[in-house]
Amino acid sequence: MDKLFLLDAYALIYRAYYAFIKSPRINSKGFNTSAVLGFVNTLEDVLKKETPTHIGVAFDPAGPTFRHEAYEQYKAQREETPEAIRLSVPIIKDIIRAYRIPILEVPGYEADDVIGTLATEAGRRGITTYMMTPDKDYGQLVSDNVFMYRPKYGDKEFEVMGIEQIKAKFDIQSPAQVIDMLGLMGDSSDNIPGCPGVGEKTAQKLIAQYGSIENLLSHTDELKGALKTKVETNRKMIEFSKFLATIKIDVPITLNMDELKREEPDEEELRKIFEEMEFRTLIDRVFNREKKTASAGATSMSHNKAQGSLFGDQPSLFDQPSTSPSSQASSQGNLFAEFEDENTENGNYSNLACLENSKYDYQLIDTEEKRKKIIQKLLTKEILSID
């Protein structure tokens, strides 16, 4: 059975970057690898746990989109893209290509619209499709075969949202009404204005009563008091906000399942990039996991038969998955997972520095300048020991 995953690249990249914001991953070259590491971690988690048969990663284009052209203030409130993210994007694209996963990008349209078009068409064909993103506006696209797949965050696991979950989250009768909700209450993350003075609760009440913005605006005579004034005064703004909030499903892109079919990665190129980024433990996990799993399985099989598996009936990451995504917890791939040194994993500490084989120099950090220097130095270290 086909299972298609469509990933919203920038949503996941930003999420990865800010997941490590208090403890950025800086390699020996001084490069902040947080966004790259977090993105790859999430991608690996999906590939290993959910084993999609087809996959694609959608990016926003470099230039403006039709929404920016229609509304100059669209997303204008957002801060400039952090330099670490800007420098990481080309590397992430190289990694995606090394995984042999198609990059989906259409000039003039956001990743939302590209995913919306492909997911809607896939749903029509009966293909089980997961849109991987934390953005709530994707809820409008959910249907019988199309689901939101929200990435894990902290202790929270991946969340799969179908029709009933979207209806419950927004207190609406249909996922399509997500657009009407956003049109009325606005969306601060995208700087969509909505109707001034109308919040989520009022929007829910109005949509429950009238079903859509169009029907509401044709019955404003039934409204009373201040609410009537707000809606009638801001009629055009409400309609325009719905336009901005609507994810397009007719972008000029074709759903080609052959092109989206999952392939084996280019291991040589992938290893080269990981080594450049100094992702030593990730290299071990990605390239040696199956070998280690097979070896461990042969060694422990008789032990498990005698005493039972440590995890009982819990399936491994490599068991054949069900058609719906796994809800099973796994620290591998978690944006917040800690990465041990590969020698620690193997129980080999012989090459680690210690007091007996290292020169050391005690220093008192008693000025702001010294504090800044020690922090900068510590940020370049992979392993830190605190007494």
Regions found by a protein language model. Name each.
Residues 1-2, 7, 201, 219:
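Extended hydrophobic/aromatic-rich secondary-structure runs
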Residues 2-132, 136-164, 237-240, 246-254, ...:
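Noncatalytic, basic helical substrate-engagement surface that gates or grips nucleic-acid strands
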Residues 3-5, 15-54, 72-73, 77-84, ...:
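Conserved RNase H-like, two-metal-ion catalytic cores of nucleic-acid enzymes
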Residues 51-56, 99-101, 124, 143-147, ...:
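Non-catalytic nucleic-acid-binding/docking modules located in mid-to-C-terminal regions
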